[in-house]
Curated annotation (Swiss-Prot):
Belongs to the thiolase-like superfamily. Chalcone/stilbene synthases family. The active site is at 164. GO terms for biological process: flavonoid biosynthetic process; polyketide biosynthetic process. InterPro entries: Chalcone/stilbene_synt_C, Chalcone/stilbene_synt_N, Chalcone/stilbene_synthase_AS, Polyketide_synthase_type-III, Thiolase-like. SUPFAM superfamilies: Thiolase-like. This is Chalcone synthase 4-1. Pathway: Secondary metabolite biosynthesis; flavonoid biosynthesis. It holds the Pfam family Chal_sti_synt_N. Signal peptide: none annotated. It comes from Medicago sativa (Alfalfa). Keywords: Acyltransferase, Flavonoid biosynthesis, Transferase. It catalyses: (E)-4-coumaroyl-CoA + 3 malonyl-CoA + 3 H(+) = 2',4,4',6'-tetrahydroxychalcone + 3 CO2 + 4 CoA. GO terms for molecular function: naringenin-chalcone synthase activity. Its EC number is 2.3.1.74.
Length: 389
């Protein structure tokens, strides 16, 4: 008779979880940051708020963002005036948009990832779908299963309302699934659409205005599995270790609430300070077992909540400016796409590493870290090992 331990051993993969493919997608509507304040105050009928517009212009100028992509066009906003007001009842209108657009954009990214992976989609065993943009039942995971034509018995995980740290969360979950289910191939999708958070400006809630200056739309998809099939599946990064922690004394630092007016966004404390104060501890826990204490010797993928977070992390750890190059590039070209951001940065890094003729997918280095920061304040840490190019 076979023992339980023998069954468990047979169920487990041998090698670490690997990222085998990455695909990204954005809406076609591109918004230039330099002209966005004019558009935003005009479309929200707020041009009379001259001082507030000047504040918003300064926020946009300091954001280090050149452009963003948004589902919400001028035409859509004119058809939905309640979305343009500050805190007007508008949840129905927003939901009607995102329950369609979130899985649609997710599909676009997933198709690219599946194509790069090179295997038939029938070999996908698990699906993780993550969004902070709206809620529905059955969820966006179900809708994507239908849109892609996946098998009905794919094991699905739907993550709603996690926020900006969730790019790390989906990797942590995918790692556990891949390593504990021999032969598993996990499709991971993060899809974010700002139609839930867009609203007009308010003199009394400048934290809401910060969100209007930073957030953009995007979807990213990965294929994750252990023990890649030689000559067929090509690993990009290996996931070695993961952790999640709530930063001490950070309650209320970042909040989001789904209300009749959509998803409200609140920054209540010194978020960059909290992140930079706690990052050292997270790094020691992650890299001490590897005997790594020089954080300039590893590659960096950090959720770009905004330039202030990146600046303070660099200063706290004494990082060289080039360490955050891929992170800052994605922030500049796409804005803050919440959970999808770090997956875009993974894609940016492996592509630029190959273009530069470097020896590994991680800017020529062997070890790296991926950080997600978000509501809680929650910090996700993923230790990555690069792959030879």
């Amino acid at each position: 008779m076979v023992s339980v331990s023998e069954i468990r051993q047979a169920q487990r993969a041998e090698g670490p979880a690997t990222i085998m493919a990455i695909g990204t997608a954005n809406p076609s509507n591109c918004v230039e940051q330099s002209t966005y304040p004019d558009f935003y105050f005009k479309i929200t009928n707020s041009e009379h708020k001259v001082e507030l517009k000047e504040k918003f212009q300064r926020m946009c100028d300091k954001s280090m963002i050149k452009r963003r992509y948004m589902y919400l066009t001028e035409e859509i906003l004119k058809e939905n005036p309640s979305v343009c007001e500050y805190m007007a009842p508008s949840l129905d209108a927003r939901q009607d948009m995102v329950v369609v657009e979130v899985p649609r954009l997710g599909k676009e990214a997933a198709v690219k990832a599946i194509k790069e992976w090179g295997q038939p989609k029938s070999k996908i065993t698990h699906l993780i779908f993550c969004t902070t943009s709206g809620v529905d039942m059955p969820g966006a995971d179900y809708q994507l299963t239908k849109l892609l034509g996946l098998r009905p018995y794919v094991k699905r995980y739907m993550m709603y309302q996690q926020g900006c740290f969730a790019g790390g969360t989906v990797l942590r979950l995918a790692k556990d699934l891949a390593e504990n289910n021999k032969g598993a191939r996990v499709l991971v999708v993060c899809s974010e659409v700002t139609a839930v958070t867009f609203r007009g400006p308010s003199d009394t809630h400048l934290d809401s205005l910060v969100g209007q200056a930073l957030f953009g739309d995007g979807a990213a998809a990965l294929i994750v599995g252990s023990d890649p099939i030689p000559e067929i599946e090509k690993p990009i990064f290996e996931m070695v270790w993961t952790a999640q922690t709530i930063a001490p004394d950070s309650e209320g630092a970042i909040d989001g609430h789904l209300v009749e007016a959509g998803l409200t966004f609140h920054l209540l404390k010194d978020v960059p300070g909290i992140v930079s104060k706690n990052i050292d501890k997270a790094l020691i826990e992650a890299f001490q077992p590897l005997n790594i204490s020089d954080y300039n010797s590893i590659f960096w993928i950090a959720h770009p909540g905004g330039p202030a977070i990146l600046d303070q992390v660099e200063e706290k750890l004494g990082l060289k400016p080039e360490k955050m190059k891929a992170t800052r590039e994605v922030l500049s070209e796409y804005g803050n796409m919440s959970s999808a951001c770090v997956l875009f940065i993974l894609d940016e890094m492996r592509k630029k590493s190959a273009q530069a003729g470097l020896k590994t997918t991680g800017e020529g280095l062997d070890w790296g870290v991926l950080f997600g920061f978000g509501p809680g304040l929650t910090i996700e840490t993923v230790v990555l090992h690069s792959v030879a190019i």
